[in-house]
Amino acid sequence: MKTFLHSSKDKQSLSNWSLRQKAGFFVFLALFAICIGMACFFNGFSLPNLLILIAIAIVSMVIYVLPISLHPVVKAVITIILPTAAFFLLESMTHVVWETMEIDAVLLNLVFYYLFFLFFFFVSGSTKISLDILLIFTMIVGLANYFVILFRSSPILPWDLLSVGTAATVANNYTFSITYLVAQLTAGFLGCIILAGKCNIHFPALSAKKTIRGLIRLALCCVLIIPSAFYVHFYISLTLRIIQALTTRCLLQNICLRQMAFSLPF
């Protein structure tokens, strides 16, 4: 009888790890240490927050070290959950999702996350590669968005990509600091990346010929590009309409104030 969690048949000791496994172990260990160190340095000693951060790091590293093999059903469930986890980890860096976002906005964002995941899954044929790309990308965007809001009190906008060079030149004028929450969420991203490596699902062999499999993957990618393009177009158009509305409102208020000033008797 199959169990949902059991030891891998090709169990290896730590000394028999490949160079990539050893490098990954020390990279993750260093990243967790950086999260803990920066959180303590910028916020002082807080035992409850520190224990949560250490617990996330320990559980993640234990998952990395243990030679476990998950049941295919468990792999599928975790794979389905991780894009949603990436969304909530990213958004929680700057606000409480359910207090600041409507349910339709949450669902629309989740659709984009799953399209992102499926696109790279069909390209690579591996859920591990696709989830790694999604999680690393969202972690970087989340941290960048956190620092942008910290400095100018507004989130990252699409046209901010055009001013990356300017931002890099003035970065030395700001102090980069993180809260315990941001450190915990970053550690959560790292834990999700480790977990994704334990539940890799390969693209099924749809044909004996690689050419046909490649064409099918390409067709699926093209199908996913269409809704993704509509999503990006909708997001940018909505942002532009909001900015235009705010600008028009400010101009109208300015005109009204000027008219009131001219009409005041002296």
Write out the residue ranges for each language-model feature:
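Cytosolic juxtamembrane regulatory segments of multi-pass membrane proteins
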Residues: T169-F176, I255-S263
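Short extracytoplasmic/periplasmic juxtamembrane "stem" segments immediately C-terminal to an N-terminal membrane anchor
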Residues: I243-M260
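Transmembrane and membrane-interface helices of multi-pass
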Residues: K2-L5, K11-T248
